[in-house]
Amino acid sequence: MESRYQPTAIEEKWQQTWAEVGIDQTPTDRSKPKFYALSMFPYPSGNLHMGHVRNYTITDVIARVRRMQGYRVLHPMGWDAFGLPAENAAIKRGIHPAKWTADNITQMRSELKRLGLSYDWNCELATCSPDYYRWTQWIFLQFYQAGLAYQKEAAVNWDPIDQTVLANEQVDSEGRSWRSGAKVERKLLRQWFLKITDYAEELLQDLDQLTGWPEKVRKLQANWIGKSTGAYLEFPIVGRDEKISVYTTRPDTVYGVSYVVLAPEHPLTLQVTTKKQLKAVKSFIQEVTAASEIERTAEDQPKRGIATGGKAINPFTGAEIPIWIADYVLYEYGTGAVMGVPAHDSRDFKFAQTYQLPIRQVIIPPDPDLNEQPILQEAYTEPGLLINSGEFDGMPSTDAKAAIVAKAEATGWGQARVQYRLRDWLISRQRYWGAPIPVIHCPQCGIVPVPEADLPVVLPDDVQFSGRGPSPLAQLESWVKVNCPTCNTPARRETDTMDTFIDSSWYYLRYPDAQNDQQVFDPAKTNDWLPVDQYVGGIEHAILHLLYSRFFTKVLRDRGLLNFDEPFQRLLTQGMVQGLTYTNPNRSDSSRYIPSNLVDPNDPKDPETGEPLEVSYQTMSKSKYNGVAPEEVINKYGADTARMFILFKAPPEKDLEWDDADVEGQFRFLNRVWRLVTQYPVIEPTTKQGDALAKEEKELRRAIHTAIKEITADLGEEYQLNTAVSELMKLSNALTDASCKDSVIYTEGIETLLLLLAPFAPHISEELWQQLGHTTSVHQQSWPQVDPSALIVDEITIVIQILGKTRGTIQVPASSSREELEEYARQTPVAQRYLEGKTIKKVIVVPGKLVNFVVADA
């Protein structure tokens, strides 16, 4: 046998062999239960990082274990390949996005294969391939036919550098683009939306089904959907026929309304403004609407407003109240107008103080001293009793909500309403590298969907990338001009492409039938494999990707393609991989991070200034100079060591701190396993199966089956992979220390160790399995089954105490009675020595643990 563990040679050998025999291909035999294991697919940026390695290794262990446990497993991989970085690369480097993306996919696929990940590459897909986005466009048409895709003019976040629309999530707290850093502007454009709000209630209610998801993720989605119960209330405008409609969750405070506020974009803003205020109001609106939504609503930003001079009437009090315009009110939310109740809303309180507006208290604490009502120093937002509220005085505020809404409905002043924070999904992007929206704009027919027979609408290759002006598609007249498929008159293609979240909202449905060129997928195949049994990915996708995927699943179900409600049964959100980070707090933000190769870890100082550095663990990134390239680790230690460290260092859901010493530790462990097997005696065992086992054989077999029991439990539904690796180490130690290496039990132990190790370190396990003389792959073996009888303990260790102090131990039969335990203890040399000449006052026996002699001096 090979005497040295040489991971590079072993790993290359087995990766090639596995590929040649197709060991990881998805089985078609439906007699076995199915298991769909899926990692969130990556954006092909060019190189794997340790976050990728962690995600994919976790999922790979799960897939490998389930195969050995008798499941037919689908474990695919693909590429979320559309997006801005490819187009930006085209602008900066003069390379076409398609080539940049294809080159990156080739590089990353090679790196994934080096990790020994058991993907069925026959299922591979890339969202930028016409073979894929043909069906993305087909799905868009399904939404359009169902009335779930529509176009309207909307205020959007506009990145003036990247020249594209940004989702709110792509704008930081300072109102800057997440990618270019440009100050985001507000701009009106005709945009395409998907009507996710039609599914808001179902998306909320079905969260209760997702018991296999982290509670944190479910709460994040529930908060994002943001269901609230309240009322629409109407405030007539003085001197006009119109009314201002507001939505409120606090109708119990309506008697405290001292002003109403309109969004700058509200259609009534100029109509309610007096001539005296008109110029100032127009200037204010122009200034405010240029700011991003994030800037306007940020908690730490002062709220700005302007009086219109107009008045409205509070129908409940009959009082005239001023109409204001403020930056924090957004037209896209609710009605685009809010009622100002400064006494009972913190934001309104600050606004009223700033602009010296009346503060009218209408709720007091439940047990107040009614004769003493001090001037409010802050808004009172808790439940209480109503005051200054007419017929509702003295009523608990929780009861007053329903009573006041009932009055509003009876008088025509308003009505009860359920509302959601969730808004329809804006999917238009003014970029090239995305799936074209399959729509034609005809001057005669209006919006005309591209016929299904004409799909895909393929991205043209002959485009120019300047990074300025309209999107490259809009500038290519030869592509834009087309005849209307309905009336044949000259028309124009839609030049917007789809948000890349569209591509990732259905990719998991395509994997079971990835090569199908006749339909989006065969419903029989997809309904057989779905829902995904275990989905693994980062917590950063808790809201958008996961919510959109749930939305797509429900729509395609309603279109008759799917027979399930939710796409992902279980979700594991793995923690971040963190690296040792050196920071000089006295430097500017752009240069505060110091590369680790320039720092002495024993005396961390700034190499230029000599200032002491702050040392911490932070998420690995290029900008922090704290990353570790997977390729470097694999080249030095092998993929199996990289996998073992990633799995051992921390529980999957927790952040992982990179530690070179622990990587070395895992390499040493695999070397011990290598020596353990390669030095395994080839002599015929002296004991046979069925022979009475000696004590040391029983102990070893107990260790073997304890490992099976514990590791199987760790790999159940909670995936405590770090403790599973610890159990592997315990078993290897037991085998190393065993004195019965010529026993059939030792043979069982060696083989069991390799079977249990195989999902974690697949290459070394396969090599050693073959060296033991097996001709079929270790990965095609059945998962070891625990023998309960092997766990039965024949002997136990009992502690002997004198006056509560431990003086020794004794091995006794596990079935010993109290009387027998006392007698065994009395007969030991240690007890006889300490009891000589003493009077035994009492004997305390704790079965399974100890015998304590309480003595007095003679």
UniProtKB/Swiss-Prot annotation:
It is an enzyme of class 6 (ligase). GO terms for molecular function: aminoacyl-tRNA deacylase activity; ATP binding; leucine-tRNA ligase activity. It comes from the Bacteria. The gene is leuS. Residues 584-594 have a biased composition (Polar residues). This is Leucine--tRNA ligase. Residues 584-611 are annotated as: Disordered. The keyword Signal does not apply. ATP binds at K622. A motif ('KMSKS' region) lies at residues 619-623. CDD domains: Anticodon_Ia_Leu_BEm, LeuRS_core. Its EC number is 6.1.1.4.
